[in-house]
Amino acid sequence: MASISNQICSADQAICNNIASVGNRDLLSQNILSQLRNLIEGIIVFTHSANPEESFHYDKVSLAMEVVKQNGRLNFLAKFHKLIQKSASHYTFDGDTSERLMLKYYEYLLRTRKMMNVHYGLNILNNLEAFPIDQDPSLREYHERIADQINTSMVSNQQLLTPERYYIHKTRPFFVNEEIFYEVTFYRAINKATKADRVIAFTSIDITDKYSAMLTLQQDAITVIGYTMPIIIIRQWEVSIRPCEFDNLAKLLTISKKVQANSKEYRFIMNILTTESSNLLDIIDMPDNKYEVVKANATNGVVSPKLFPILDKARYIIRPKLAGHNIIRYLMLTMFNKTLKSQFDRGGCANLSALSLKYACIPFDQMPFCTSLSGHNPRYWDLVESLDTADKQHELLVRKVKNNVDHQGVLYTPVAELSQYDNLDTLIRTFNNNLYYKHRSTRKLISDKGHVFVAGYEIDTAAIVTKLKGKSSHGIQGYTEAVERWLSDSNRDIDDALKVTALKQLFCKSYVALIYGAAGTGKSTMVNHIANYFNDKQKLFLAHTNPAVDNLKRKVSAQNSVFRTISSQCYTAENTNYDVLIIDECSTVSNADLLSVLEKTSFDLLVLVGDIYQIESIQFGNWFSAISSFIPSDSIFELQTPYRTSKQSLLNFWNKVRSIDDDIAESIAQNDYSSVLNSKLFQPSANDEIILCLNYDGLYGINNVNRFMQSSNPNPVYTWRETIFKVGDPILFSETGRFTPVIYNNLKGRIKAIQQAPGWIQFDVWLDRPVSQFDVLHLNELTWISSSVVRFTVYDHPGTSDEDDDSYNTTIPFQVAYAVSIHKAQGLEYESVKIVITDANEDDVSHSIFYTAVTRARKHLKIFWTPETQQSVLNKLSKKTNTKDVHLLKARCGL
């Protein structure tokens, strides 16, 4: 039997040999993952043993693990071990997934090496730096400056903000001189919050992202690329679950309790969660004797315990695995108020141990890895961490097939892609048999013609095709002649022969017309021509986002026109019959939304407008690219003449990206479209300029770029909690409930004036829409000041985070918007466009996203990225084609 030290040394040697000998990161990661568990278990036993030369037995691991969990200096080893058990020890990953895991583990390995060297004098993982963790070099200077500020020990209390409770959205480690630091994305722990409310800060503290936390923040700044950039540093941290979240968990468990943040038992539990890096499930899963000790210590001297009756009831459900235990386990891992409230049903559910849960929660309790909770889609790794992963192969199979649909737009998954699942037919049968009989027809898996798919997706797609084919079976007699006469009589100036031809032939063979067109080819102009021909008819214009709807309003000059978002149309109760229904930006419309529109809207003629190469729908949406295979070709028109720009260099570049030519990189270099991250990002190239980012988080996400850009605004600073505002800031509204219908989601504006006093802040805001005093007559909290300028106040109520508060007036209803997301820019255009892409989000840059971004520019284009990121993005560009899905759909559904 090997000794403890031999166990460590052999695993260490295997890991180091792999790092030294293999250059391929994917293979390297897979080799290392198989050794991680051996190394960490050896170290855990080593820290507990007085004699490292003792024989290593696996039965020593569990005992040593319990000791390690209680040690604040060592408990990260238990956390690391748990992560390894739930990943490499249980699943076989492809290279890319293993690599991502290794990058996550790199932090733990660095901590392990430092701990073993400093406290035990042992040197392990000597060549860990040779593993290519591939940090973006463009961020290195920022990270070094941030690390310097974090390591500055002299911090006065005047520099610190009052501690506030925040939700931790995610943490991301970065490394400077073998030290570990964290980029933390967080937002206020209140019920009403959006992606735009997220803030990033930096710290050397290892903060859990499972629960809300009390953070003490420091407003600071760093100097990089000649600019002073504001940053936030987290100086102190402790777990601080909102009391209302315990109250809502209690309701689910049929208990009525009011937990107080200042109670002894609350503070005791928060201290355990903070100092031991543990979660509530660690307490729930304790042996009875240990749990009773913790309970006794927490409630000693407490007359009427509030928190432990909740934990007692949770243990009663979870320990014997009663019905509902998976739901309660998952909820206790994350304790997110909105999710907790969404599961509540006062009437209770007899099938879930009579807990106050919705019946809609049953599928998740039975098959959590392939279903969702009410109004909430759990993250995969949260499921792995909170639930038993044994005997879940049928669920993981379904998850794989559904991911192909939702993320790849692939309706039919080839059986060859599912080779890792043994006994495929048995797994499919197991899943289908576990479905509720009323759901089986749409949710069941089907294996046919060498492919596996979810029945409901096929049913919806076939229903859309059937409805549109029915509408396209006949056209309008005399339509072409009528249009020709209208063109002659109205002297309408249409400067594109393709548009004239399309207008004449639009409905002569079909009641459905498709208008495709590359970016800038005048699709909106074509829509306006159609609208004006049908000027005296009732017309409904739909688009997915408010900016796209606003764009239609600006472009369409015809009378009798109604404009709505897709979602508002899906929920409208009107029964107006429209002569013409026009849907813009069709690539962004999901199958489910289109089917809802077709079923709920009465119309005669249908015009579908969009570009299959621009951003696709977030949910499954294959209909727009597939429908051209099912309706008459005479009703399909493609606009080709570009009007957005006259710059031939831009046009050539757009065409190369659209068709994914081999010389995209050469075109970028020739036209100087590329730059590393530098001061040019913050120097305007035109008045009409926008910075486009892929997402909200990260050093170069939307929210932080907004902070950087705001620092160039010379007006005085107004600080509201962790956020800064200045007169002159451009803004984008994200909250609609408080000021509906005057202010709506994605409405643009600009701050004109700010007043502030303890407990409140008041804004005068110019809105990018006409507003009169009459418009705000019935809105008590909105005051009209002058032309399109309105005033409102936001309040700061102490204890808002403790209570289950759904009020709007404590939330800033807008975001500072020097930068916006690529998704929100679809359908819009700017004289100058700057795009920021870092290695943190390069994997999310699809062909449609990249093409949409670069085609927003009329004159100036600059992409800020490293050469490595550019190469990675360009190499991964590929068009999503669904010809196989179309053939299978025709064969299976008789279409």
Put a short name on every predicted segment.
Residues 490-511:
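N-terminal pre-P-loop "Q-motif" helix
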Residues 504, 508, 512-669:
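ASCE P-loop NTPase helicase motor core
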Residues 120-127, 133, 138-476:
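N-terminal accessory nucleic-acid engagement/regulatory domains that precede
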Residues 477-490:
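Conserved adenine-nucleotide phosphate-binding loops and their immediately adjacent elements
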Residues 2-203, 211:
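Extended low-complexity, intrinsically disordered and solenoidal helical-scaffold regions
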Residues 521, 560-564, 633, 645-648, ...:
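Core RecA-like ATPase module of SF1/SF2 helicases and allied nucleic-acid translocases
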Residues 513-556, 609, 664-708, 717-724, ...:
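Conserved RecA-like ASCE P-loop NTPase motor core of nucleic-acid helicases/translocases
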Residues 461-472, 654-657, 853-857:
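Short amphipathic C-terminal alpha-helix that caps PH/PH-like domains
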